[in-house]
Amino acid sequence: MNLIPAIDLMNGKCVRLFKGDFNKRKDFTKEPHEQAKFWESEGAKCIHIVDLDAAKTGSPTNDKSIKKIAKTVNIPIQIGGGIRSQERIEQLFSYGIEKVIMGTSAIENKELVKDLSNKYPGRIIVGIDAKNGKVSTRGWLEQSNIFATDLVKEFSSFKIASFIVTDINTDGTLEGTNEEFIKSILEITDIPVIASGGVGSISDLLSLVKFENSGLFGVIVGKALYENKFTIKEANNVLSSERLNDFDLNRNYYA
């Protein structure tokens, strides 16, 4: 299971939201490309970027920062936020982005996802953001009546790289993940799953290890890293397969 550090962009800055609320945002001082480079030096194997401005409006405004990150690091980058056309995807690929995340567009235009996953197999990720099990779109500003599990079933026949599933109620809280939600997704798909939302300690990471053999490929972490709850080096050390037996999964490490 891989730890994937997150960079959420607003107005060219690194920010974090609380439960997806744009009015509850916290800005961080490092420039996005500096933050990405630091995490690469800590041992990150991939960087997760979300363009929050684009997610909200559909119009990309952080491309300068995105390009700079892509030029600064030598590890794969996956990016989401306002990606709603083939033209936008190809533009991001031209910047050096490895994979793109389709969220709102996946729900509103499933044929586009199917076509693009056929054209770019293994490079399209479907992002599913859910609140109380139901999907939210457009930067989490709109709530649907569609169950996340129904979408996962539908997209599991596509040639996508993975699902990223976010539990909005835990995102930015540092209070732990929604294990039942994660489990419900893993039970219905053979496609790799990346979980997001709620990780606040090493113990939270360890609690997800049991899902690794069920298809949990990685976990996205943002606020906990920014606020120094633990480091990527510490997490990688703990999550390395040869070290897991050293830890009591019921004990609270670095809480």
Curated annotation (Swiss-Prot):
It comes from the Bacteria. CDD domains: HisA. Pathway: Amino-acid biosynthesis; L-histidine biosynthesis; L-histidine from 5-phospho-alpha-D-ribose 1-diphosphate: step 4/9. PANTHER family: 1-(5-PHOSPHORIBOSYL)-5-[(5-PHOSPHORIBOSYLAMINO)METHYLIDENEAMINO] IMIDAZOLE-4-CARBOXAMIDE ISOMERASE. Its EC number is 5.3.1.16. The active site is at D8, D129. It catalyses: 1-(5-phospho-beta-D-ribosyl)-5-[(5-phospho-beta-D-ribosylamino)methylideneamino]imidazole-4-carboxamide = 5-[(5-phospho-1-deoxy-D-ribulos-1-ylimino)methylamino]-1-(5-phospho-beta-D-ribosyl)imidazole-4-carboxamide. It is found in: Cytoplasm. Belongs to the HisA/HisF family. It is an enzyme of class 5 (isomerase). GO terms for biological process: L-histidine biosynthetic process; L-tryptophan biosynthetic process. This is 1-(5-phosphoribosyl)-5-[(5-phosphoribosylamino)methylideneamino] imidazole-4-carboxamide isomerase. Signal peptide: none annotated. Transmembrane segments: none annotated. GO terms for cellular component: cytoplasm. Pfam families: His_biosynth. It comes from Prochlorococcus marinus (strain MIT 9301). Keywords: Amino-acid biosynthesis, Cytoplasm, Histidine biosynthesis, Isomerase.
